[in-house]
């Protein structure tokens, strides 16, 4: 649906996203994007808000456009208080020029995108560049993830942090933990 909508009307995402009344949330990160996005949507709907959401995790440009196009009524307009949109980190380059989010939720940043992007630093650079294009966007960041927290602190955007207040488990594992050390201070 998104690919066809973009062919017919290339500005569709820009136009429909402007009709969201209260705010647009984007959810990015390596793990938990779909779950976080759907929980956020459910919380807003439980408060009586009307929400556009890409529930199935179609998180690249065509999927985001499809969520908005399918959320439009027969009159071609969105009737939504909020939008909760899961976005693939690299796809922010295609989505942010068309849609200006009010909030970005960052779950974490790990090496899973290695097959697509080569290095975690490439993913971080893409996100940092796109965050700079929306200086008013409030970042809602997993403070327990050193890479996400560093990126938020370095961005200059307003931000709030969430996480676990104390360590639940301190057992060491053999898994690669590239986000284990802070890029700013080197601490765990």
Residue ranges: model-predicted function:
Residues 183-187:
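Short, cysteine/histidine-rich loop/knuckle motifs that typically chelate Zn2+
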Residues 1-163, 167, 171-181:
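Phosphate-binding loop of NTP-binding sites
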């Amino acid at each position: 649906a998104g690919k066809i909508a973009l062919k017919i009307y290339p500005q569709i995402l820009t136009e429909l996203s402007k009709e969201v009344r209260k705010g647009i949330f984007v959810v990015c990160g390596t793990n938990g994007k779909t779950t976080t996005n759907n929980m956020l949507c459910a919380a807003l709907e439980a408060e009586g808000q009307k929400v556009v959401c890409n529930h199935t995790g179609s998180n690249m440009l065509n999927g985001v456009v499809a969520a908005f196009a399918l959320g439009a009524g027969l009159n071609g307009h969105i009737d939504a208080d909020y939008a909760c949109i899961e976005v693939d980190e690299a796809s922010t380059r295609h989505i942010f020029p068309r849609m200006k989010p009010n909030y970005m939720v960052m779950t974490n940043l790990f090496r899973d995108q290695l097959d697509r992007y080569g290095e975690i630093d490439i993913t971080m650079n893409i996100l940092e560049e796109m965050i700079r294009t929306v200086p008013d966007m409030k970042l809602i960041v997993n403070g327990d993830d050193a890479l996400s927290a560093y990126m938020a602190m370095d961005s200059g955007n307003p931000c709030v942090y969430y996480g676990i207040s104390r360590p639940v488990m301190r057992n060491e594992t053999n898994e690669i933990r590239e986000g284990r050390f802070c890029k700013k201070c080197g601490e765990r």
